[in-house]
């Protein structure tokens, strides 16, 4: 099997994933998964598509990850891994889509408007 690559985005985070056959090692920006994401919840989020397909020990994954915060990065990585797994085996798409791993979450920060302190917040109104 050749190396399969995929891209995942969430908020400002971008994850480029390179999947090859291996032993289940996930390397993010030349660091181990547990070192990059110390939180077990974020590690769980990243591994969700692999666990769903019971493929956690089948593939080695190298990741270039930049932008955003921890949560956005972990969710961008989850999307990228799911897309790469579908490229490897298209029959897995329905199983991953039913869990919501194939959907790009398009929500992002709303821009600040002029004449207001924030996107929705208005300056304090004084009646008198």
From Swiss-Prot:
GO BP annotations listed: translation
Ranges of compositional bias, category Basic residues: 114-128
Keyword set, alphabetical order: Ribonucleoprotein, Ribosomal protein
Domain of life per record: Bacteria
A cellular component annotation (GO) from this entry: cytosolic small ribosomal subunit
Stretches the record annotates as Disordered: 97-128
Gene Ontology molecular-function annotations: RNA binding; structural constituent of ribosome
Record bears the keyword Ribosomal protein: yes
Bias (Basic and acidic residues) ranges: 97-113
Entry similarity comment: Belongs to the universal ribosomal protein uS9 family.
Name of the protein this chain belongs to: Small ribosomal subunit protein uS9
Source species taxonomy: Bacteria, Pseudomonadati, Bacteroidota, Bacteroidia, Bacteroidales
């Amino acid at each position: 099997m050749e190396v399969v690559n995929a891209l995942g985005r969430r908020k400002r985070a971008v994850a480029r994933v390179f999947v090859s056959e291996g032993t289940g090692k996930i390397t993010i920006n030349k660091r181990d998964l547990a070192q990059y994401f110390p939180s077990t919840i974020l590690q769980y989020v990243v591994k969700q598509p692999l666990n769903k397909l019971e493929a956690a020990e089948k593939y080695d994954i190298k990741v270039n990850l930049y932008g955003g915060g921890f949560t956005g990065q972990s969710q961008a990585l989850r999307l990228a891994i799911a897309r790469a797994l579908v490229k490897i085996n298209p029959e897995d798409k329905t199983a991953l889509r039913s869990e919501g791993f194939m959907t790009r979450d398009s929500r992002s920060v709303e821009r600040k408007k002029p004449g207001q302190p924030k996107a929705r917040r208005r300056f304090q109104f004084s009646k008198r």
